[in-house]
Amino acid sequence: MQAKLTKNEFIERLKTSEGKQFNVDLWYGFQCFDYANAGWKVLFGLLLKGLGAKDIPFANNFDGLATVYQNTPDFLAQPGDMVVFGSNYGAGYGHVAWVIEATLDYIIVYEQNWLGGGWTDGIEQPAGVGKKLQDDNMLMISLCGLSVRILKVRQRHDQFNLLHKHPKKETAKPQPKAVELKIIKDVVKGYDLPKRGSNPKGIVIHNDAGSKGATAEAYRNGLVNAPLSRLEAGIAHSYVSGNTVWQALDESQVGWHTANQIGNKYYYGIEVCQSMGADNATFLKNEQATFQECARLLKKWGLPANRNTIRLHNEFTSTSCPHRSSVLHTGFDPVTRGLLPEDKRLQLKDYFIKQIRAYMDGKIPVATVSNESSASSNTVKPVASAWKRNKYGTYYMEESARFTNGNQPITVRKVGPFLSCPVGYQFQPGGYCDYTEVMLQDGHVWVGYTWEGQRYYLPIRTWNGSAPPNQILGDLWGEIS
């Protein structure tokens, strides 16, 4: 049977489903299986069989329709493939989704009900985009003539063969294991920070605003012998990248990581490194190592993972930190849009808590990103470039977006981002510019753009003068898109 849509037509159809809910069989609400069936029905006018998503490769006759492929380490999924997750997902029922992008390390999918709970009426878990690290328990299914493949998450034992009516009993496969953390305790020597007199009450998770080279080892090399004057600019307890944890302070010591007396004294600060320079996959791995270290410490101190013990830097002071995690897991960028709203803050905290609890329970969680984040789109781009500082004291970084002015004129400057620079013209309400650079200077956030061969500098909000990532920004004078 020929599919009713081409691959490109089907991908476009999937994109139109985002934000909607599907209950094809009218049972148990909006399940992942319903979303797979919605796509299958569009393609063939048929419904898939199976008690749970994990049964799809076994309970259906795909002759002339599709081919089941082993998701081996060198297998590269294609857009339009269907991915089937095994029984270690979905409380034993598995999971199913449609692939729209893939590498050998991860897949980006359209899916429904990844978080569970879709059986309850009113649950707001519509179809959306998610990112999944490649797992050892998936299958892929490819449609004949369309390359929609049902991919079983990578099984490294006997190759699965759809033609076997009674597949061989699978040998037990090793369960995924957490990475082995390399914990280096080398306490800073330039100043002996005071003791708190008790265990920490919890952990504050930071993003370091560091470049690609700002690894845990790099921080160690730069800070372990740093003088007091440097440590006063900020020192956390631990720095994490890859599988390396540099412990810069003893657990009993106060840190200088929140610009707040309570946060510094009672909470252990951990920096997720490379938050400005690393690609998304690298940063997500750094996050996972951080969650694993958080789990180890909380268990050591006899503390649970909850909203009281897992804290964010922006709970203690007005800051964009943790900026990269905010973008990836809530879709909100506090660097360009201002302080993280309370609902987004709780969303981010709860994601952290869920990941940490999994490690505390001996499980290996799957990193996910918000469908509002650029990391979940088909054209993944870095969340932010590294802030740099020039000889004039201007912080700047590359960023391409459109600013649309609000209801008041703004004075545009030439030459540079200073209020003392020559006036260019009055940027009128409702006007817009496509900028390529963001700057912090002279009490304002500026964007730089070129119009008719002239470079212009436009202030778009106030800035308190604090260096990134601790800058405090005023309300935006328009909109960024």
UniProtKB/Swiss-Prot annotation:
It is an enzyme of class 3 (hydrolase). Coiled coil: none annotated. GO terms for molecular function: N-acetylmuramoyl-L-alanine amidase activity. The keyword Metal-binding does not apply. The keyword Manganese does not apply. Keywords: Cell wall biogenesis/degradation, Competence, Hydrolase, Secreted, Sporulation. One of its GO terms (biological process) is sporulation resulting in formation of a cellular spore. Its EC number is 3.5.1.28. GO terms for cellular component: extracellular region. Pfam families: Amidase_2 (PF01510), CHAP (PF05257), SH3_5 (PF08460). Autolysins are involved in some important biological processes such as cell separation, cell-wall turnover, competence for genetic transformation, formation of the flagella and sporulation. Autolysin strictly depends on the presence of choline-containing cell walls for activity. This is Autolysin. It comes from Staphylococcus aureus. The gene is lytA.
